[in-house]
């Protein structure tokens, strides 16, 4: 290969790589995950947990998504002691430091995250929140705001209208696109689990942009944050929307 051919080849490769980088940037990149649980399904296999033993058909989490967590990608336990990390991994959440929140945020979190009855907020902060640049107040404030936005969308309406019935991936993607813009459904992954002989939908994980990691996200548009995330495979293709109760 002559020097001229080599330069031409090198230039062509660089342009291809640059084009790929631009395309990736245009598609967005997931920096945070919003994990939203369908609590009745979670409780089918965790019936002894306080939040499950106390669940009723009238409670908020029976017909709305619950906040599992807000997770920075590929980071966990930032600046956490080995003892606290070990306690967290052993499920000894009651031994972890209390999460100091304002009365308003604490009340909002108790509604959005029924797992607070088992110390879930302590686990989420130790494992995930410590890897954000937010205060504990802002971290949970953002999480509550985002799951509230999900619960005022066509996605929640779809689930609430189909309790006890099977919902397919295509319908869920369409609901995301309806509420959060074209392509939003391509940034969602669905998880299912077995409850006896029935496959129930247990959780949705939603890809978000880096802007989800700022205190300003407490007033951000969930549609904008999803739009800035990267595409993913949907996972479970269908499942039953479980009703409260065992």
Which sequence ranges carry the predicted segments?
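N-terminal signal peptide c-region/cleavage motif recognized by signal peptidases
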Residues: 18-20
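Bacterial N-terminal signal peptides that target proteins for export
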Residues: 1-10
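Domain-level detector of nuclease and nuclease-like folds
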Residues: 48-246
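Compositionally biased, low-structure terminal segments
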Residues: 10-12, 235
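N-terminal module-boundary/linker segments of secreted carbohydrate-active enzymes
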Residues: 24-51
């Amino acid at each position: 290969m002559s020097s001229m051919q080599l330069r031409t080849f090198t230039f062509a490769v660089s342009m291809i790589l640059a084009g790929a980088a631009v395309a990736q940037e245009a598609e967005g990149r997931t920096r945070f995950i919003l994990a939203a649980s369908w609590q009745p399904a979670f409780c089918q296999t965790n019936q002894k947990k306080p939040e499950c033993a106390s669940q009723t058909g009238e409670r908020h989490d029976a017909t709305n998504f619950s906040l599992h967590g807000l997770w920075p990608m590929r980071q966990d336990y930032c600046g956490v002691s080995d003892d606290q990390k070990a306690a967290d991994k052993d499920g000894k959440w009651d031994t972890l430091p209390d999460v100091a929140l304002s009365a308003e945020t604490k009340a909002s979190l108790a509604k959005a995250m029924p797992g607070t009855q088992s110390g879930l907020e302590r686990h989420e902060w130790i494992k995930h929140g410590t890897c954000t640049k937010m205060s504990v107040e802002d971290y949970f404030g953002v999480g509550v705001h985002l799951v509230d936005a999900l619960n005022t969308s066509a996605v929640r309406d779809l689930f609430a209208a189909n309790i006890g019935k099977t919902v397919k991936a295509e319908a869920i993607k369409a609901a995301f696109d309806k509420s959060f813009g074209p392509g939003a459904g391509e940034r969602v992954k669905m998880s299912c689990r077995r409850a006896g002989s029935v496959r129930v939908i247990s959780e949705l994980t939603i890809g978000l942009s880096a802007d989800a990691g700022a205190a300003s996200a407490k007033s951000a548009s969930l549609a904008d944050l999803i739009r800035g995330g990267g595409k993913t495979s949907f996972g479970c293709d269908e499942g039953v929307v479980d009703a409260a109760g065992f």
